[in-house]
């Protein structure tokens, strides 16, 4: 079996018709899934980026069924607002934008899950675990990670696979 199920927001509203379709699809899935199964949400950018509205997000948070959102808003005020909306619920916000990774963590996001965790997860892990205790170093690291993320558009995922092949963690760079 599975430990949890992550629902992709653009699949809950495939034609981007709005909240009515989103909620209808979500309700049918929730009725069919075991109530004990932890659920997540991912605002996957493909085939289109379907960000949750505040009402949709709050409903999911307050339902008690959802434990994680992979936020792809790329907008710190949105992450901050969602963290506030989720307070007191099981729902945790995980940011996926490297440019705001550290500020989002400081705002209460429960970590980072963007493309660059495929390159150097240990650096993001350190930032999450130790950053608040070593602010000067964390601030410098955050700048480095943000600047490094510019290379995301230079051939990902192939560039990550080449990197791991050179580290010896992958046998091939085939995509």
Which ranges hold each PLM region?
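Active-site beta->alpha loop and helix N-cap motifs at the rims of alpha/beta catalytic domains
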Residues: 1-51
């Amino acid at each position: 079996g599975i430990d949890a199920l992550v629902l992709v927001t653009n699949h809950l509203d495939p034609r981007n018709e709005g909240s009515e379709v989103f909620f209808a699809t979500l309700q049918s899935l929730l009725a069919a899934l075991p109530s004990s199964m932890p659920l997540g949400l991912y605002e996957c950018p493909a085939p289109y980026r379907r960000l949750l509205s505040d009402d949709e997000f709050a409903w999911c948070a307050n339902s008690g069924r959802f434990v994680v959102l992979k936020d792809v808003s790329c907008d710190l005020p949105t992450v901050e607002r969602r963290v506030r909306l989720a307070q007191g619920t099981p729902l945790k916000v995980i940011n996926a934008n490297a440019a705001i990774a550290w500020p989002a963590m400081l705002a209460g996001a429960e970590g980072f899950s963007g493309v660059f965790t495929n390159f150097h997860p240990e650096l993001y892990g350190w930032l999450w675990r130790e950053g608040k205790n070593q602010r000067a170093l964390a601030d410098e690291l955050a700048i480095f990670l943000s600047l490094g993320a510019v290379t995301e558009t230079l051939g990902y995922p192939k560039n990550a696979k080449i990197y791991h092949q050179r580290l010896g963690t992958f046998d091939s760079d085939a995509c």
